[in-house]
Amino acid sequence: MAKRSGVEIRDLDAVRDMPAIRRIWREIGWASDKRAEKQIPVFYKAGSCSVAAFDDEAECAVHAIPGQMQFDKTLLPLCVIAAVTTSRIGRGISLAQRLTARELAKARQRGDAVAVLGMFDQGFYNKVGFGTGAYVNEFALDPASLDVAIKPRTPSRLTTDNSDQMLASLLARPPLHGGVTINIPSLYKAELSMPSDGFGLGYFQGETLTHFIWMDGDAEHGPYKLRWMGYRDGAELLELLALLKSLADQVYSVRLIEPPHIQLQSLLKRPFRQQAIAGKGKFYADQNAYAWYQLRVLDVSQCVACIHHRGPALRFQLAVSDPVDEILAGDDLWSPLGGTYVVELSENSSARLVEKGDECPDLPTVCCTVNTLSRLLFGVSPATSLAITDGLEGPGPVLQALDTIIRANPNPGWDF
């Protein structure tokens, strides 16, 4: 890894480093106005942050916050890499890579089982063990095309002063595999406060906000961007979609990520016709599937224990390699994750790291990187597919059995 003399790697000092952090955000275009810049210190009050400094001036920072991730029926402790920022003079010398690895090590020491991040593009974070997440669907649609027959009630207007209630509504959504939650009220309010044109509409039951939408966009006819949608059940979700449809008198286009509990296309009137007519321009109609996030396992045993298989037990050896083992070699923060595990998938699944020389030669062996293992365990892609695309190696019958055992289609349902 390339190094630069005089680089100090340390924890963030909020008082000393904040002017430099603000400067970096301006340089990379994340703080477009004073309103957004005002929220920067709020973000860094939560979680953990590592910085790389030249002459005591921070030039790169990696910020991690705690969360939870649903693995089938189990909630796992989660590390969210929330911000990776590098100044104009700090690029090309692997600072972000080193700091990200450092935050992963700290998260692993805290007991986090998995880490996630939103990627600016695919490839960079693979160097620290991340694998690409599952596809999500993004829609641009005319709200009038929503095929929802119910008539919504008159909603209440919401502002950032309702942020705690909105967060509680998000946390009350039905759990789903791969679902992420980040319960940090100050951080959520700061995020809502950054765009100057954000607004919310929602419904109360007494003092409780039961379901809501939060959007931004100040043009007369849109397009609006739907940022957050909280609900407790399907009936409330349908009312929110009906509420969105009611805006069609004035709003021509809304962009949104598909709500994770439904297939939105089935609730659109003639979607292909809409896309053909409005395929280009400001108010286009479109549907795209892509993976915007990545994930990586931090604790193999914790993750494997979440798999509950009622059929015949599947036992095999798992040989894993992890690039962070080399990046942080000799660092007391990190104990190697790579090695050989004896894995059993059953009603009480387990993965046990074995010492060299204690391997079980009678068991079939599956070999992969931690990047591929992360995609495998969370069901991003089946084992037989990963054998084609990601270098997963193992006997065909074992890979086919993994295809049927591991739950598929994780969906974070949360922007991070």
Task: Give the residues covered by each predicted segment.
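C-terminal interaction segments
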Residues: L353-F416
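A short, internal acetyl-CoA/4′-phosphopantetheine-binding micro-motif in the GNAT/acyltransferase core
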Residues: I81-R91, F120, K225-G234, T372
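Conserved acetyl-CoA-binding loop-helix of GNAT-fold acetyltransferases
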Residues: T86, R91-A105, G234-K245
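Conserved active-site alpha-helix within GNAT-family acetyltransferase domains
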Residues: Q109-A113, M119-N137, H261-K280
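C-terminal hydrophobic structural anchor segments
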Residues: R315-L377
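Amide-forming acyltransferase catalytic core, primarily the GNAT-like/NAT-type
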Residues: Y135-R227, Y231-L238, A242-L247, Y252-E258, ...
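Short amphipathic alpha-helix that is part of the acyltransferase structural core
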Residues: M1-P66, K73-V80, L146-S186, E220-R227
